Amino acid sequence: IAGVQGSFDDTDEVERIVENAMTGIAGIRGILVVSGGQAGVGRAFEKLNIQDRPYVIIYDQTPKNERALKSNVVDFLIDQNGYVQGYRPPHILADLLLKGREPEREFWFTDINIKTKYNL
């Protein structure tokens, strides 16, 4: 691990971080972006004219991220089923507070899917 950087969901900041890492740290084989601003990775690669780029992993299956995957800007996309994760907890809480209804079970597990351009 070369380091952990905060980008504040800012594309320009992600671009700067990737540029600095690629020019200042030898042997980078992978980049994981867990925030917004993933487009900064591709912009940094273009600016640096990188031919043999590291593997890139990003989060959230959005149309924009699917395009990045299909166009070989990134290699892997981790989908956490954000709709279910964002919908179910407030629904459970509302049922508990407004209706006094306990959740059906203690834990609700959601899927995590790893996508490549071949299984989109």
Predicted regions and their residues:
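Hydrophobic alpha-helical
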Residues: G6-P63
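Hinge/cleft segment of the Venus flytrap/periplasmic-binding protein
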Residues: N81-L120
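Short beta-strand elements at the ligand-binding edges of bilobed clamshell
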Residues: S71-Y83
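Conserved active-site and cofactor/substrate-binding residues in soluble primary-metabolism enzymes
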Residues: G36, K64, V84-R88
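Hydrophobic residues at beta-strand termini and immediately following loops
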Residues: V4-Q5, I78
